[in-house]
Amino acid sequence: MAEAASGAGGTSLEGERGKRPPPEGEPAAPASGVLDKLFGKRLLQAGRYLVSHKAWMKTVPTENCDVLMTFPDTTDDHTLLWLLNHIRVGIPELIVQVRHHRHTRAYAFFVTATYESLLRGADELGLRKAVKAEFGGGTRGFSCEEDFIYENVESELRFFTSQERQSIIRFWLQNLRAKQGEALHNVRFLEDQPIIPELAARGIIQQVFPVHEQRILNRLMKSWVQAVCENQPLDDICDYFGVKIAMYFAWLGFYTSAMVYPAVFGSVLYTFTEADQTSRDVSCVVFALFNVIWSTLFLEEWKRRGAELAYKWGTLDSPGEAVEEPRPQFRGVRRISPITRAEEFYYPPWKRLLFQLLVSLPLCLACLVCVFLLMLGCFQLQELVLSVKGLPRLARFLPKVMLALLVSVSAEGYKKLAIWLNDMENYRLESAYEKHLIIKVVLFQFVNSYLSLFYIGFYLKDMERLKEMLATLLITRQFLQNVREVLQPHLYRRLGRGELGLRAVWELARALLGLLSLRRPAPRRLEPQADEGGGGGSGGGGRRCLSGGCGAPEEEEEAALVERRRAGEGGEEGDGPPGGKEEDEDDEEEEDEEEEEDEEEGEEGGLLDCGLRLKKVSFAERGAGRRRPGPSPEALLEEGSPTMVEKGLEPGVFTLAEEDDEAEGAPGSPEREPPAILFRRAGGEGRDQGPDGGPDPEPGSNSDSTRRQRRQNRSSWIDPPEEEHSPQLTQAELESCMKKYEDTFQDYQEMFVQFGYVVLFSSAFPLAALCALVNNLIEIRSDAFKLCTGLQRPFGQRVESIGQWQKVMEAMGVLAIVVNCYLIGQCGQLQRLFPWLSPEAAIVSVVVLEHFALLLKYLIHVAIPDIPGWVAEEMAKLEYQRREAFKRHERQAQHRYQQQQRRRREEEERQRHAEHHARREHDSGGREEARAEGSGLDPATSSEKASAKAKGSTAGGHGPERPKRPGSLLAPNNVMKLKQIIPLQGKFLSSGATSSLAAAGAGATTRPPPAQSPTGSDTRLPAFLSFKFLKSPETRRDSERSHSPPKAFHAGKLFPFGGTRAEPGSNGAGGQARPDGTPSSGSSRVQRSGPVDEALAEELEAPRPEEEGSGTALAPVGAPALRTRRSRSPAPPPPMPLPRPPTPPAGCWQWDGPWGCGGEGAAPRQALAAAECPPCAMAGPPPAPQPLPGDASFYSLPPPPLPPTSDPLETPAPSPSPSPSPQAVCWPSGWH
């Protein structure tokens, strides 16, 4: 199961125990109360700027944590264990620690991963990384198979930035999906529905955010926030906050730089053209045309700049997701998707349309009417102020300032209304949701910000009044926005929301005055509250951390007091530390001041600890119940893993438990209730006696002995290493109290309104661009400061550009042409410059000027490409490389497919050949039986011969499944292979000199020498080679010599010539046949083996064309006409079976052996007598060839004379003749 442990990154007070979460029905302390208790009530609601900045410098960094997941304080153990188990099973790459934040009373999962797991996650995410120069440079998606080509892949610290690590972990968490039918309490998941977003939308998970990395953050503070006159470190911003935020600051910096031109030009015109009306009219027309050209150039140049940055950051050609995940907030009815055939939520479009028509549209119109009425009210108030005589000049701007304040306040209300309407319209995809939200907010902001200006310019037609209103709105709104952006993250109430009310301002002023006062009041005495179960025990619940580092103004005076209080903890209940009278006097002075705040907050003294209360995690040990000694703090940390695991325990079964408060209240008080889950060791020891298995410490006991007893009784617990007494807050708990950074939506919205002020009505007020320039210089640093100090760190997002805001600002540029041309024509500038123009001519001139400006804008848009040339070339290179890689991949895939097809065809061919071989064996066995029956032989003997033949054909092989030689060996395409053997017959027959053998019952006869095989282990050639292809050296023609192989040719590779019986004294070893007819196998007999020779030997057992096709037997010259051999039919039985001679007839090839009918190892057959084969038994040379009668065919060569032998049973020695003639072969039809 999951590894869970209390973390080592946080610190806790020794000897102190945090409070348990309140029981049901008791209100939980707000999460925002942590900082109130850290810094005392004097800074209550004073502002998050001072608070968080001071606490930030004194927090303990959280190590080995990339993403923090927090839960509400009411979360039960079952929910935590269920989610923890799903994370560990579904995402085994993650390392999760479980902790409990003491002050916020929130559970938290500290999530991180190892470097190897992050590499696999980068491959899954498709994260683009820089490639080494020797491999082509540039960037490409990460691949684990080619990890060696990426830069810094060897370094764990330099390869991944913290933002990339967090993005990979977020990708894993968002892809943790539920199975069919899974449910958690009342939350029922669909199949493959993301679990984490759904639980966050339901409020079960409070927040999921990445943790700041203080080392990099401090460097950013120096190079970005504090370096006002330097360029922004955009690459560092991208590496830390992601592409989306870096793209916003790049756009803001580019916009601010471009604002220099209209600011300078407008300031010059405003300075030198205020002398007379004509100069002002000329400057108005010229500046309007200048703004049209400038806005167009700015937008087009930003496209090019944005393309360069997107290419540099690897997002220019990032492919969009093919299937976008539904929003977690999307609701509907369950149905089966017609596309994926899976269960999904469905919301009918007609319901959304009905809501838009009946709710959204009326509310939007009502808001516009409210804006119009507020504007009219402010104008009436201004008319009233102007009608009063004797008021100062500044009083004239009070109604305008009030209108600007109302516009700013209304903008926030309209934004919340737009978000509510968008949520109620229930959009399924995030892109559709964001698109409609932008439309609503832009519509509200446009009407709310520009309605008064349009009213003055188009209806009142008063340029002077328009200039004053524009200056008031622009300056006031920019000032309020900067103040709100900087202070709102630091001004908060219990719920953590930023409010800028009068009470917050008053509290901030009081806090600042208190800090600046010369006399700093001493701290009041802390007494244990009676409602906590009381007693002046040494429990940590009734004490307050005052040892410094908390940020309270009186911490220096309290530090010494705490040390004295520690020494006197076990004293009498009524005794107090020295200095008590002084504290009582100070308390009387501050009693009236703080009484109201005490009633408001309802604080409990036990929650004022500054130490971090860690959730304890224990493992139930399986097996023997022997007590294990407590591990050392160093042994609790596994090497390479930030998760703490107890040595010797099995991390398979674990539970969570609340830790008892140490000496907190009486045993019967509500705060002294036993924990919900008690942990017992395997030996049966419980923890119901005290917080750590021991007795509760008495009030008078020493704290050192208590801590020692805790260490001794903590063998089954996983506690963090004991550290020095530190009241500092952990970084993770502090960041969980910060306000969440919503998005760049609010920042773009402010810049959109400012851009409209500059380009729409700048002809009336040329200094608007200068005011915007000054504001933007402050805006960059204030936004940077807000991100680095006052807000949670956002997850990095990869975007290609600024998105829809580019189109919105382009539409604003087109609208600016129309508005400025109308102002020039209707406000009198054109009539004063050209008094001779009639009203109709003036209108035509304005229309012509408008069309000319639109044409100029279009030409600039077309003339300037959106992507620079060098970026386009690099993109073309990447596209070419991508296509080549795709082609290479296709070729490899096709090659693999062809190999698979070839292997499959070979397997099918092998199976067919094996089936054919088995069928042929079956048919040959049937023919043998039929022949045996026709010849009068015993069928059992024939079956034995058939089985012996099968054994001989498979001898030395791997089984009977090997195919035999195909019958097409002598086909025309194989003639060339066979002809290569013909010129080598002299070599084959040179060592094959033989002596004659006497036939059985006959005298001494001379036998021709057998043929010598090319392998040297056989003295005979195959029968089908002896007649048709082999020729004597005298009859060879020169044309046949050209077919001789240039190198030594081993016929044994093509035909197996080994394994036959040779006569003694010949080159091949052999043995004589025994008198009983069985062949003798001598020790010198050569057994040929090997896959090639054996396979070819089996192939030679197949019928040959001469056997099956012609049906004609061959005979030597001078023999009588042979009987015609009929194919595939048994020969007629002979009149009388003759006894088989012990030795083969001279010159007869048909004997048991590799070239005989039975094969090597076959059962001996009864051979015919010498009279049955007269040509073979004749001694001496045969007569000249003569034609045979009938249709019998023959081929013979004159055999050489053989020396006579005295012993007919003696095997003749090989003849030394260098080139004897081949032997004649006799095939009796009855033998085959």
Curated annotation (Swiss-Prot):
N-acetylalanine PTM sites in chain numbering: 2
Compositional bias per record (Acidic residues), positions renumbered to this chain: 582-606
Residues carrying Asymmetric dimethylarginine: 1020
Primary location group: membrane
Pro residues composition-biased segments: 1130-1145, 1197-1221
Extracellular side: 2-244, 303-356, 422-437, 772-807, 863-1232
Compositionally biased spans, kind Polar residues: 1078-1087
Keyword GTP-binding: no
Lipid bilayer topology: Multi-pass membrane protein
Biased segments, Basic and acidic residues type: 14-23, 904-932, 1031-1043
Membrane spanning residue stretches: 245-265, 282-302, 357-377, 401-421, 438-458, 751-771, 808-828, 842-862
Region (Disordered): 1-32, 524-650, 681-728, 888-970, 997-1152, 1174-1232
UniProt biased composition (Low complexity): 933-953, 997-1006
Tissue: Expressed in embryonic stem cells, fetal brain and neural tissues.
Cleavable signal peptide: none
UniProt family annotation: Belongs to the anoctamin family.
Miscellaneous comment as given in the Swiss-Prot or TrEMBL entry: The term 'anoctamin' was coined because these channels are anion selective and have eight (OCT) transmembrane segments. There is some dissatisfaction in the field with the Ano nomenclature because it is not certain that all the members of this family are anion channels or have the 8-transmembrane topology.
Name of the protein this chain belongs to: Anoctamin-8
Upper taxonomic lineage: Eukaryota, Metazoa, Chordata, Craniata, Vertebrata
Gene name in the database record: ANO8
